[in-house]
Amino acid sequence: MSLNRQLLFTYYFIVSLILFSDFVSSATLPKEEVDALQSVATALKKSNWNFSVDPCDETLSEGGWRNPNAAKGFEDAVTCNCSSVICHVTNIVLKAQDLQGSLPTDLSGLPFLQELDLTRNYLNGSIPPEWGASSLLNISLLGNRISGSIPKELGNLTTLSGLVLEYNQLSGKIPPELGNLPNLKRLLLSSNNLSGEIPSTFAKLTTLTDLRISDNQFTGAIPDFIQNWKGLEKLVIQASGLVGPIPSAIGLLGTLTDLRITDLSGPESPFPPLRNMTSMKYLILRNCNLTGDLPAYLGQNRKLKNLDLSFNKLSGPIPATYSGLSDVDFIYFTSNMLNGQVPSWMVDQGDTIDITYNNFSKDKTEECQQKSVNTFSSTSPLVANNSSNVSCLSKYTCPKTFYGLHINCGGNEITSNETKYDADTWDTPGYYDSKNGWVSSNTGNFLDDDRTNNGKSKWSNSSELKITNSSIDFRLYTQARLSAISLTYQALCLGKGNYTVNLHFAEIMFNEKNMYSNLGRRYFDIYVQGKREVKDFNIVDEAKGVGKAVVKKFPVMVTNGKLEIRLQWAGKGTQAIPVRGVYGPLISAVSVDPDFIPPKEPGTGTGGGSSVGTVVGSVIASTVFLVLLIGGILWWRGCLRPKSQMEKDFKNLDFQISSFSLRQIKVATDNFDPANKIGEGGFGPVHKGIMTDGTVIAVKQLSAKSKQGNREFLNEIAMISALQHPHLVKLYGCCVEGDQLLLVYEYLENNSLARALFGPQETQIPLNWPMRQKICVGIARGLAYLHEESRLKIVHRDIKATNVLLDKELNPKISDFGLAKLDEEENTHISTRVAGTYGYMAPEYAMRGHLTDKADVYSFGVVALEIVHGKSNTSSRSKADTFYLLDWVHVLREQNTLLEVVDPRLGTDYNKQEALMMIQIGMLCTSPAPGDRPSMSTVVSMLEGHSTVNVEKLLEASVNNEKDEESVRAMKRHYATIGEEEITNTTTTDGPFTSSSTSTANANDLYPVKLDSAYWNTRT
């Protein structure tokens, strides 16, 4: 009987398990959360989430919801918390996926979401203020393109534990409201454009364990209230903009294990009191103006792994207690005023110690040695007993006198243009002797280094090179030497005279594609002969792109045989893109050439036989005859005939596009057959052509009478060749032969937006509302790229409907960069030559030549209103009645009837909310005061519905802003005194790449001071 009971019990137990299993497996994700995930996917442009399966089913290995076998750094996971009947999404982690959307605005549909990690993607836009109403515990947006300010609403996230916003494009001040986060532990804000002082409310952040604010533009001093952060474990303040001294209150933070403060300006100060920091592992106080002796107590810290006190003014001997640091991984005392003997324990330590540029007495090392303590330039000149200030080189013997220096940094020996470049392949920091009259010293180790390939102090990568100039030897740029702190090359045996130092650079660690790996920013300083020649040098900016070569030249005089070149990292730039450990100086090659004719080396004279005079005379005569003969032949063939200035200018430029011959273009266009003419642009005629491979092209030809000249032509080539974006017209190449100046573009089937909207009836394209919305957003995205996202900061200057082209899918592409203006160094410019199209130009630009990207924003606003209305900003109903769209829109707003602007051809088939938003955005963009106009990234966010900015409120403020009224009146007087021919006006045609908007309008019409009913009623 007992056996039967036991069997019965077992049976019920198994059945219960089965029923329970079925019960648990029936747990589902609420529809509201599924819908919210779909919204998140749409915003992020996350396309591989499979909504046909359960996102919370952890047994699924496919479907895009999780990828347990992903490579290091890549994460793709949605995590749920499931009870017996229901599941809730708690974590969304999407790392290193190059997502190219924007941040999801509304997270209210995911009420249980605790973590949102979008590290290392290509997301743009701003941080939605709506996130402040969520229950998030951790937010990470590290390594994206997020711009705008940090919303104060995040201060409402009382549950927030981690906020990681490093390596973005955030600007403005830190909102004081963040000081109200009672549970905040990690706050990472490094490598943005944040400004202002650290908010005093941060004194309340007593739960902080990790704070990083490096590479920003903060002002003020490091606050004393840091003593309140009693649980702080990591503090990183490198090149933050804050000034010293380091407050003594920092000594109260006994839990610190990682302290990195570098590049502080301000007065000299003594070493901060750190005696109580017995748990310290990483102590970096570089370039902080510290004075006095090294504190002896540091030698008693047995947990220390990295000690960097470089570039200060510390003096005195190295304390005897520092012998206890023999197990420390790295010690850097570079560039101080330390003196006395170099301790024997340091000599025996090897290349993990760097004491270069100090005042030590001569040490036990008679000669410099690789893989030994780096004593390069570590002895006072008074002790070295020679003219050198390099102690371990005091016995260096020059093999001969050199009249040049050529180094293939990080690479093998090569011969380029008959010049031998020495190898530079050593892979460990420290000292290196080439045995060819030059040495080098590399200081620093890359902290938090995640690199897994190549060497730690050199890099090889030819896949990213974009060198098309045949005069540049690409082999010099396929590798590079790296340094974490400071890299020095020193020639020791140069002959006396004047030289030109050529430093060769190419950024080969970033990626040019629209991926997070191209978001890195590298900055370092360049010193020649001890003088800082360049501060905050950025290879990508100088070379106009990734993988492109640039050479910096510096004249020097050598008097004692020695030439020193030093590259130094000053704490700026990103440190974790594409991975952690990518920062600091990078150089491809060094070439130093004499500005004089060097003397011949011994043994190069003549031997017996003919006299020197006879030999020289024969050689000269033969050479002259040969030159004349060859020259005559080449002249007869036309090879030596003078080239046009344009050809000469073009030959000296390195554009990343193809070069077409005039013969190819003539074949493609049937010798510019008038039947193939499709328009008349600002440059001249535009012809359709078909290449031999079947590619359809549009050829823009610069006409002799064009108002746009050589400068604009070369400018357009330079701009477009460096830019790639879905909403910019693609430039295939160009042709420069004699006076023939041609641009070869992709052919866009649907011509211009102006032709589609308000061209001749037979050319118009019926554009429904979704098409118009798509076109408007596309234009905004293209401009946002030009202004904020491209390596170059570009102001187009001539945005209008005829400069927006439409492909076969009606995707908009911005064209005609002939008027584009680089904006590299300053945020504003006073243009000496106003160029644009009347009716689209912003008032401040039309009147004063005051050019910023806000001029493009104004022009975009006009185009946006034209898209809604379907008519040009200025069009005539009759000879006596000229219609001005901007005037009418403002009057309709005053009458609260803005939707009357909508194109009657749409009828009622349009989204009223979207239309109203587009009209308001257009009005906001055309605000008279530039400061009232939004950035284009903000415009994109508003158009896509990702921003909660109250457009109506902003518009109200801008309309009531009278600060620019006098300037507008002045502008009207200005236009009253000049002829209409002085404004850039060209006729409208039906071809692409055209300019338009010829108008008889005057300044009073286009830029009225008060846009209200009274003005409208008094117009004539």
From Swiss-Prot:
Pfam families: LRR_1, Malectin, PK_Tyr_Ser-Thr
Residue ranges annotated as Extracellular topological domain: 27-614
UniProt organism field: Arabidopsis thaliana (Mouse-ear cress)
GO CC aspect terms: cytosol; plasma membrane; plasmodesma
One Gene Ontology term from the biological process aspect of the record: regulation of innate immune response
Protein name: Probable leucine-rich repeat receptor-like serine/threonine-protein kinase At3g14840
Family: Belongs to the protein kinase superfamily. Ser/Thr protein kinase family.
EC numbers, comma separated: 2.7.11.1
Cytoplasmic domain ranges by topology: 636-1020
